[in-house]
UniProtKB/Swiss-Prot annotation:
Cited HAMAP family: DXP_synth (MF_00315)
Cofactor(s) listed in the protein's UniProt record: Mg(2+); thiamine diphosphate
Function of the protein: Catalyzes the acyloin condensation reaction between C atoms 2 and 3 of pyruvate and glyceraldehyde 3-phosphate to yield 1-deoxy-D-xylulose-5-phosphate (DXP).
Co-factor note (free text): Binds 1 Mg(2+) ion per subunit. Binds 1 thiamine pyrophosphate per subunit.
EC category name: transferase
Superkingdom, natural source: Bacteria
Organism the protein comes from: Bradyrhizobium sp. (strain ORS 278)
Keyword Oxidoreductase part of the UniProt annotation: no
Protein name: 1-deoxy-D-xylulose-5-phosphate synthase
Residues that coordinate or bind Mg(2+): D151, N180
Catalytic activity from the UniProt record: D-glyceraldehyde 3-phosphate + pyruvate + H(+) = 1-deoxy-D-xylulose 5-phosphate + CO2
Pathway terms, separated by semicolons: Metabolic intermediate biosynthesis; 1-deoxy-D-xylulose 5-phosphate biosynthesis; 1-deoxy-D-xylulose 5-phosphate from D-glyceraldehyde 3-phosphate and pyruvate: step 1/1
Length: 641
C-alpha cells in the first residue's frame, strides 16, 4: 500500500535556500505543512508549543524574503524557534528537542549558522541585533539584521534601552514585534494591511525623505508644522506606532501575522529600505492552527508529550508536591496571619507558586512583568515602608537584578525575602536556565541570610523563618520539580538563624550537605556503610550565617569532611573552607573536599543524568570518599559484589 507524505512540499526543503526557489503561490502550503510538522514533533518531545505555532507564517515569510543566514535573524527568548529549526536544516533532529545530545529548545550559536545569536532569557534581541548592525556598517557590509521580539519581552527595560540607542544611531536594523497577546495592537484588517504596504513602500519613503530634506531649507516654524502633520496623519491612520516613532524607529503595522498576502509584500519593502531602524508590528495568535492550544494558550505555552487528537498531555502523577506549590501554599498560610506579607513575581506566577498566593490575596500580589531589576527595587520600597515582600524569581533570572540586590537591598539591609526557585540544574532547558550561581553571587554580599531547603518540609519552615527575619534580607533556594514525599508539617516554625542539623552520626567521614543533595548523601552513607565506612550526615540549612559550631565539630571528629551542594565554585563549600582555614583546621590531618557543579555550562538532559555527570549523585559521593582515601572505587565495588 502506497503511503503519502503529509508534508510533500516541506520534504523538499533542507535549507531556506530551497524555500526561496519556490513560487510565491506555494509558500502558503509550506506554512501549513510546517505547522503540522511542528505539532507532530512537539507531541513526541514536549516543549514550548504555543509561541511556535503562532509564528509559522512569519517564520516562513522571513526565510522566503530574506537571505538567511547572510541576513542575520535573531529570535528573542527562542520559545518560538522550533519552526525556524525545521526550515534551517534541523528537521531530521527535531524529535530530539530538549533531550540529552539532541537539539536545544532555544537558539544556539553552536548548533547552526542560522542561529547567529543564542537566546533563552528575554529582551536581548534588539541589543544584539544593533551590535551586529553596527559591526556590519563598520565592515562595509550590506546584509540585513532582523530581530523578532514578542510583546511580553517588550515589558523589559533592556528592549527600550536598545531601541533608544538604535534610534539615536539611525542604524539600519529591522525589528519585528510579534504581538501575540493583543496587548499593544488595535484590530487589524484590510485597511491596516494596505496602509502598511503603502508606508513601507519605496515611493512613500522616498517622498518622505525628500520632504525631510526640503524641510531643512524651510523656516523652522513651517518645517515643524509640516513634520507634525505627517506624524499626526500616520498616527490617525496607524494607531499604535507613536511610541516607536518617538524612539526613532519607522513604524509599519499592525499587520496580520497569519496572512502571507500581507506579510510578504511588507517584508520585501522593509528588506529593500536602505536607511534607519524599522519596526514591523505583526499580530499573531498563540497556538494558531491547533484548536486546544488556541482555546487555552496558557496551558499550551509549554507542554509535556501529548495526544494530537485530544490535546491530552502525558503528565505523570506526582509522588510528592512540587516545590513551587509548597512555597505558594506556605506563603498563603503565613499571609493569613500577617497582613503585611505581599508576593512579587516577574512574569512567572505559576512557575514560582505565586499564582497560589494570588488566588488567596489578589490585592497583595504583584506581577511586574519581565522586569527583574524593577521587581527587586520595588520589593525594597515595600520593605522600607514596613511590608514583608516575598520576591519569587528563578535563580537564573535573579541574575538580571543583581545590582539592585546589592545597591537597593543589601547595602540598606532591607528585609526583602527572596524565594529562589529552579536552584541547581533544571534539565531540559539546559545551561541558560540552570540555577548554578546564586550561592556564589549572593554569598559574597554582607547582610544576606542564605538558606537552602533539603526537602519540602524544610521549605515550609524556611518560609516561616523568612517572615521572622525583619532586619535584613534573606533568601531560600529550592529546585525544580517534586519534593521527596516526606511528612509535611501543619504549620511552619521559624528556625534558629545560622544553625544546621545532624541527620546521622558516624565516625570516619562527614558529609555536609547544603540543599536537596541531602537525599543522595543518605544513599551514599548507606553504600559506604556496606564498605565498612561510617559516615555522619549533616544538613547545613544555612550558608550565611554559617553554623560554625557544627562545621568545627565535623572537622574535629572526622578524618574526612566533604561538602555537597547544587551550585558552582565559590559557593557553600568555599565558605566552609574559608572558615576552616581561618581557624587553622586545614593545617593538620583533616582531609577536606568540596563537591560542586563542574566549572562549565552543562547542556540539557534530565536532571538525574546531569547530576550524575557532575558527580553529585550517591555514586559520585562514594567515589569521592574512596578517592580521598586513595582507593579505587571500581575495585571496591567489585569486592562488595
Amino acid at each position: 500500500m502506497t503511503t503519502f507524505s503529509k508534508t510533500p512540499l516541506l520534504d523538499t526543503i533542507k535549507t531556506p535556500e530551497d524555500l526561496r526557489r519556490l513560487k510565491v503561490e506555494q509558500v502558503r502550503q509550506v506554512a501549513d505543512e510546517l505547522r503540522q510538522e511542528t505539532i507532530d514533533a512537539v507531541s513526541v518531545t514536549g516543549g514550548h508549543f504555543g509561541a511556535g505555532l503562532g509564528v509559522v507564517e512569519l517564520t516562513t515569510a522571513i526565510h522566503y524574503v530574506f537571505d538567511t543566514p547572510r541576513d542575520r535573524l535573531i529570535w528573542d527568548v527562542g520559545h518560538q524557534a522550533y519552526p525556524h529549526k525545521i526550515l534551517t536544516g534541523r528537521r531530521d533532529r527535531i524529535r530530539t528537542l530538549r533531550t540529552g545530545g539532541g537539539l536545544s529548545g532555544f537558539t544556539k550559536r553552536a548548533e547552526s549558522d542560522y542561529d547567529p545569536f543564542g537566546a533563552a532569557h528575554s529582551s536581548t534581541s534588539i541589543s544584539a541585533g544593533l551590535g551586529m548592525a553596527v559591526a556590519r556598517d563598520l565592515s562595509g557590509g550590506k546584509n540585513n539584521v532582523i530581530a523578532v521580539i514578542g510583546d511580553g519581552a517588550m515589558s523589559a527595560g533592556m528592549a527600550y534601552e536598545a531601541m533608544n540607542n538604535a534610534g539615536a544611531m539611525n542604524s539600519r536594523l529591522i525589528v519585528i514585534l510579534n504581538d501575540n497577546d493583543m496587548s499593544i495592537a488595535p484590530p487589524v484588517g484590510a485597511m491596516s494591511a494596505y496602509l502598511s504596504r503603502l508606508y513601507s513602500g519605496k515611493t512613500y519613503r522616498t517622498l518622505r525623505d525628500a520632504a525631510k530634506q526640503l524641510g531643512q531649507h524651510l523656516p523652522k516654524v513651517i518645517a515643524n508644522r509640516a513634520s507634525r502633520v505627517e506624524e499626526y496623519s500616520r498616527g490617525f491612520m496607524m494607531d499604535g506606532g507613536t511610541l516607536f516613532e518617538e524612539l526613532g524607529f519607522y513604524y509599519v503595522g499592525p499587520i496580520d501575522g497569519h496572512n502571507l498576502d500581507h506579510l510578504l509584500p511588507v517584508l520585501k519593502n522593509v528588506r529593500d529600505m536602505e536607511t534607519g531602524p524599522i519596526l514591523v508590528h505583526v499580530v499573531t495568535q498563540k497556538g494558531k492552527g491547533y484548536s486546544p492550544a488556541e482555546a487555552a494558550a496558557d496551558k499550551y505555552h509549554a507542554v509535556a508529550k501529548f495526544d494530537i487528537a485530544t490535546g491530552t498531555q502525558a503528565k505523570a502523577k506526582p509522588n510528592a508536591p512540587a516545590y513551587q506549590n509548597v512555597f505558594g501554599q506556605s506563603l498563603v498560610k503565613e499571609a493569613e496571619k500577617d497582613e503585611k506579607i505581599v508576593g512579587i513575581t516577574a512574569a512567572m506566577p505559576s512557575g514560582t507558586g505565586i499564582d497560589i498566593f494570588a488566588k488567596a490575596f489578589p490585592k497583595r500580589t504583584f506581577d511586574v512583568g519581565i522586569a527583574e531589576q524593577h521587581a527587586v527595587t520595588f520589593a525594597a520600597g515595600l520593605a522600607a515602608e514596613g511590608y514583608k515582600p516575598f520576591c519569587a524569581i528563578y535563580s537564573t533570572f535573579l541574575q538580571r537584578g543583581y545590582d539592585q540586590i546589592v545597591h537597593d537591598v543589601c547595602i540598606q539591609s532591607l528585609p526583602v525575602r527572596f524565594a529562589i526557585d529552579r536552584a541547581g540544574l533544571v534539565g531540559a532547558d539546559g545551561a541558560t536556565h540552570a540555577g548554578s550561581f546564586d550561592n556564589a553571587y549572593l554569598g559574597c554580599l554582607p547582610n544576606m541570610v542564605i538558606m537552602a531547603a533539603s526537602d519540602e518540609a524544610e521549605l515550609v519552615h524556611m518560609v516561616a523563618t523568612q517572615v521572622a527575619i525583619d532586619d535584613r534580607p534573606s533568601s531560600v533556594r529550592y529546585p525544580r520539580g517534586e519534593g521527596r514525599g516526606v511528612e509535611m508539617p501543619e504549620v511552619g516554625v521559624a528556625l534558629p538563624i545560622g544553625k544546621g542539623r545532624m541527620i546521622r552520626q558516624g565516625k570516619q567521614v562527614a558529609l555536609l550537605s547544603f540543599g536537596t543533595r541531602l537525599a543522595e548523601c543518605e544513599k551514599a552513607a548507606d553504600e559506604l556503610a556496606a564498605h565498612g565506612l561510617s559516615a555522619s550526615i549533616a544538613d547545613a540549612r544555612f550558608m550565611k550565617p554559617l553554623d560554625e559550631e557544627l562545621v568545627l565539630k565535623l572537622a574535629r571528629d572526622h578524618e574526612i569532611l566533604i561538602t555537597i551542594e547544587e551550585g558552582s565554585i565559590g559557593g557553600f563549600g568555599s565558605h566552609v573552607m574559608q572558615y576552616l582555614a581561618d581557624q587553622g583546621m586545614l593545617d593538620g590531618g583533616l582531609k577536606m573536599r568540596s563537591m560542586v557543579l563542574p566549572d562549565e555550562f552543562q547542556d540539557h538532559d534530565t536532571p538525574a543524568a546531569m547530576y550524575a555527570r557532575a558527580g553529585l549523585d550517591a555514586k559520585g559521593i562514594v567515589r569521592k570518599v574512596f578517592e580521598v582515601l586513595g582507593k579505587d572505587y571500581a575495585a571496591e565495588a567489585v569486592k562488595l559484589a
